[in-house]
Curated annotation (Swiss-Prot):
The lineage of its organism: Bacteria, Pseudomonadati, Pseudomonadota, Alphaproteobacteria, Rhodobacterales. This is Phosphoribosyl-ATP pyrophosphatase. It comes from Cereibacter sphaeroides (strain ATCC 17023 / DSM 158 / JCM 6121 / CCUG 31486 / LMG 2827 / NBRC 12203 / NCIMB 8253 / ATH 2.4.1.) (Rhodobacter sphaeroides). The gene is hisE. SUPFAM superfamilies: all-alpha NTP pyrophosphatases. It is an enzyme of class 3 (hydrolase). NCBIfam families: histidine_hisI, PRK00400.1-3, PRK00400.1-5.
Length: 103
């Protein structure tokens, strides 16, 4: 199991937890829209660090993006396995061809 899979499992386990007991549970309690908003905020922070060129800060913000992506997905009952299956299906396909196939 990868660290991302372990994190996804931890996020999923927090869905029913007391919001006072964990940040993840608190996000879930605020609803999927708030989870999506927080993901967007973290993505913007990662973009800023990418533009600035600070590798360590970008890596840290990217970790936050991955965490908040998992929370947002879980809030809508989409699993990491589902996302990985989409990536696997796209593997080996030209990005241009794949995008054209979406219609």
């Amino acid at each position: 199991m990868t660290v991302l899979e372990r994190l996804a499992a931890t996020v999923e386990a927090r869905k029913g937890a007391d919001p006072d007991s964990s940040w993840t549970a608190k996000l879930f309690a605020k609803g999927p829209e708030k989870c999506a908003e927080k993901f967007g905020e973290e993505a913007v922070e990662a973009i800023i660090e990418a533009v600035r060129g600070d590798r360590a800060k970008l890596a840290s913000e990217a970790a936050d993006v991955l965490y908040h992506l998992l929370v947002m997905l879980a809030a809508r009952d989409v699993t990491l396995a589902e996302v990985m299956a989409v990536l696997e299906a796209r593997e080996g396909t030209s990005g241009i061809a794949e995008k054209a196939g979406r219609g």
